[in-house]
Swiss-Prot record:
Protein name as catalogued: Bacilliredoxin GK1781
Organism of this sequence: Geobacillus kaustophilus (strain HTA426)
InterPro entries in UniProt: BrxB/BrxA (IPR009474)
Any GO BP: cell redox homeostasis
Family (UniProt): Belongs to the bacilliredoxin family.
NCBIfam families in the record: YphP_YqiW
Length: 145
């Protein structure tokens, strides 16, 4: 891959990364960062698997950020990996999504290291932002303190 293409992709996805970081998500960009985080994690973690696709931009990211802002019950941790960009980090995080096929965008709520709620692309695409947000809020309400 050419350096110009890689630079272009970095510039293209930066606003997509920033949208989640501004909402309080911590980016995990390497498999080592994922491993280190998961090794010491306790409580609940909301994981957002980011993507460049339209349903991530128009539905998933707005639903996730609004759910985090609006929810009275919040996860202890908010983290994100970027499918297609930070491939090793995404692959490492997906190892914790036992029983769930790779999907991007997607969201997982973990209690400790176990997935207790998963929202695959199929539950995002062709749904309203409000429906996706309600799905997230219901999971926060059920599993978060």
């Amino acid at each position: 891959m050419s350096m110009a293409y890689e630079d272009y992709m970095r510039q293209l996805v930066q606003p997509m990364r920033d949208e989640l970081v501004r909402a309080g998500f911590r980016e995990l960009r390497t498999s080592e960062e994922v491993e280190q985080f998961m090794k010491q994690v306790e409580g609940t973690t909301f994981v957002f698997v980011n993507s460049v696709c339209g349903c991530a931009a128009g539905l998933a990211r707005p639903a996730a950020t609004q759910a985090v802002l609006r929810s009275e019950k919040k996860p202890d941790h908010l983290v994100t990996v970027f499918a297609g960009q930070d491939k090793e980090a995404t692959a490492k995080m997906r190892e914790y999504f036992v029983g769930y096929p790779p999907s991007s965008p997607s969201m997982a709520l973990l209690k400790g290291k176990e997935v207790v709620h998963f929202i695959p692309r199929e539950d995002i695409e062709f749904h309203s932002m409000e429906d996706v947000m309600e799905n997230i809020l219901a999971a926060f309400d059920k599993y978060c303190g």
